[in-house]
A protein has these predicted regions:
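Short catalytic-loop micro-motif centered on adjacent basic/acidic residues
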Residues: 60, 151-157, 267-268
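Active-site-proximal helices and loops of the catalytic beta/alpha 8
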Residues: 49, 67, 72-76, 139-141, ...
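Short, flexible loop/turn elements at secondary-structure junctions
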Residues: 15, 36-39, 65, 158, ...
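Short, basic, glycine/proline-bearing loop/turn elements
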Residues: 30-34, 259-270
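Hydrophobic faces of well-ordered beta-strands that scaffold small-molecule active sites
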Residues: 9-11, 59-61, 152, 181-183, ...
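Substrate-binding/active-site clefts of carbohydrate-active enzymes
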Residues: 3-147, 165-175, 180, 191-192, ...
């Protein structure tokens, strides 16, 4: 990675996910202080960070503040009755993130978004509980200090309590001013994403200390625009229309621009496996404003053609496993 010019490594959550199925996802954490034993130990993770640093590569840790896994040891004896939202009973989130910024939204609509659960196996944590809020803040600070992290990626950022996010981001940036933190706010509306960036000062007075967010709008525009005919609102105009809204961001140059990620179809697949368009997308990504992020396997044209199954999208990198016909580390079997 260092030879290819990468300066940071972002791993999906490496903490314990003690579940009977789909544990490869990593987002249903069952112990916030322990690396999943299938990966190794806390010490081996810290050594990985140190080894990467010696090569000029920093480590970005994927953190989950909104929910945990239903197999977390908390579930056996909750610290308090309000540790989870909705009386610890599954009530699905609406995923309508816009309600948090909508001046016309009903309070119940906002609550259903932020207090609802993703799925029944991911209890939604109540950060309005001061003990839980302190726990999550201290846990984040501990991992930065213990492992020597250079950055944090926060999953499902806007789903957590807004007041808590203000305090969490304040504490993190106060303690580590040079630590970059990127939040996941999956919206194709730049204004919705910009609400969370430090310095935005929206009309409702919300204060955020979050330095960076993922630019989902630009990724979507590239994936669609490069394969479309030019029209009033299609083709390359999609990309222009997104960039033309940069004024809503306090710092568009600190947004993370990305080719694709583990939650969506790979760009190579989305572009019909056309190498010319894929190269064009990468060239744009690496030269436009923002911090570029590339998913593993992009360099060997990994694809999920014909399926949106996340297990396929997140397939193992070829090589290093017994029986692999292709080895992308050595070049064996590659076309």
């Amino acid at each position: 990675l260092a030879v290819m010019g990468y300066t940071q490594l972002w791993l999906n959550p490496v903490l314990a996910n003690n579940h009977p199925d789909v544990t490869y996802r990593g987002y249903a954490i069952t112990d916030f202080y322990q690396v999943d034993p299938r990966f190794g130990t806390n010490e081996s993770f810290r050594q990985l960070v140190a080894d990467a640093r010696q090569r000029g590569v920093g480590m970005i840790m994927d953190m989950v503040l909104n929910h945990c896994g239903s197999q977390h040891w908390w579930m056996q004896d909750l610290p308090s009755r309000d540790w989870f939202n909705n009386d610890s009973q599954f009530v699905a989130t609406t995923h309508v993130r816009e309600t948090l910024q909508d001046t016309h939204a009903a309070a119940d609509d906002r609550r259903l978004f932020s207090d609802g659960w993703f799925v029944a196996t991911m209890p939604d944590m109540n950060q309005r509980n001061p003990h839980l809020a302190t726990y999550l803040i201290q846990n984040s600070l501990w991992w930065v200090e213990y492992a020597g992290l250079s950055g944090i990626r926060v999953d499902t950022y806007s789903y957590s309590d807004r007041a808590f996010l203000t305090e969490w981001s304040r504490r993190m940036t106060q303690e580590y001013p040079n630590l970059n933190i990127v939040g996941e706010e999956w919206s194709s509306n730049p204004s919705t994403v910009a609400y969370w960036q430090r310095g935005r000062n929206p009309p409702d007075g919300y204060v955020s200390y979050l330095p960076s967010l993922f630019d989902f709008a630009l990724q979507e525009a590239v994936a669609m625009g490069l394969k479309e005919a030019e029209g009033w609102g299609t083709g390359l105009r999609r990309i222009y229309k997104v960039l033309a809204q940069d004024s809503v961001f306090p710092d568009p140059y600190n947004l993370v621009v990305f080719h694709d990620n583990h939650d969506m179809s790979r760009m190579f697949t989305a572009l019909g496996e056309r190498q010319d368009l894929n190269r064009m997308a990468l060239a744009f990504l690496l030269t436009t404003r923002g911090i570029p992020q590339i998913l593993y396997g992009t360099e060997v044209l990994m694809s999920n053609k014909g399926t949106e199954d996340h297990g396929i999208i997140r397939s193992d990198f070829p090589g290093g496993w017994a029986g692999d016909a292709k080895n992308a580390f050595t070049g064996q079997g590659l076309s």
